UniProtKB/Swiss-Prot annotation:
It comes from the Eukaryota. Residues 33-56 are annotated as: NMP. This is Adenylate kinase isoenzyme 6. The lineage of its organism: Eukaryota, Metazoa, Chordata, Craniata, Vertebrata. The gene is AK6. Residues 33-56 are annotated as: NMPbind. Expressed in heart, brain, placenta, lung, liver, skeletal muscle, kidney, pancreas, chorionic villi and the central nervous system. The keyword ATP-binding applies.
Length: 172
């Protein structure tokens, strides 16, 4: 049976992981958090002193994921998307969060001032939405609000309906 691949992207702290795990448990699709995968497999290419974090080796990430993506049925969660092959995804969801809500979430994570400011600006200027629309066909890129628990439930329901319809359309 053919299954769709879904990308969840957006600024850190918008709720990609929460949504991805919830979707995976309700849909049976496989959830992959690229940050966790990179940590587990050491898919790094140096260290960024300014942001105090490792630099992702994007080519190695693509190599690591390619077979699973070809098989289908994968939900990928990452705060960037311009290095993933366009053919991988059937739909892309960019999660958006109000900056005051986002600030609190990132502060709780212990982000330093520079990381906080840059991520808030990233959200204000819709950087990841623009990256998504530049990387994928516009008709497969959708924005979802991600501020409150009710919005999470609504997003899960909407995406589950989309998955169900996609499976019907591609397996008959």
């Amino acid at each position: 049976m053919l299954l769709p691949n879904i990308l969840l992207t957006g600024t850190p702290g918008v709720g990609k992981t929460t949504l991805g795990k919830e979707l995976a448990s309700k849909s049976g699709l496989k959830y992959i958090n690229v940050g966790d995968l990179a940590r587990e497999e050491q898919l790094y290419d140096g260290y960024d002193e300014e942001y105090d974090c490792p630099i992702l080796d994007e080519d190695r990430v693509v190599d690591e994921l390619d077979n699973q993506m070809r098989e289908g049925g994968v939900i990928v969660d990452y705060h960037g998307c311009d290095f993933f092959p366009e053919r991988w995804f059937h739909i892309v969801f960019v999660l958006r969060t109000d900056t005051n809500v986002l600030y609190e979430r990132l502060e709780t994570r212990g982000y330093n001032e520079k990381k906080l400011t840059d991520n808030i600006q990233c959200e204000i200027f819709q950087v990841l939405y623009e990256e998504a629309t530049a990387s994928y066909k516009e008709e497969i890129v959708h924005q979802l609000p991600s501020n409150k628990p009710e919005e999470l439930e609504n997003n899960v329901d909407q995406i589950l309906k989309w998955i169900e319809q996609w499976i019907k359309d591609h397996n008959s």
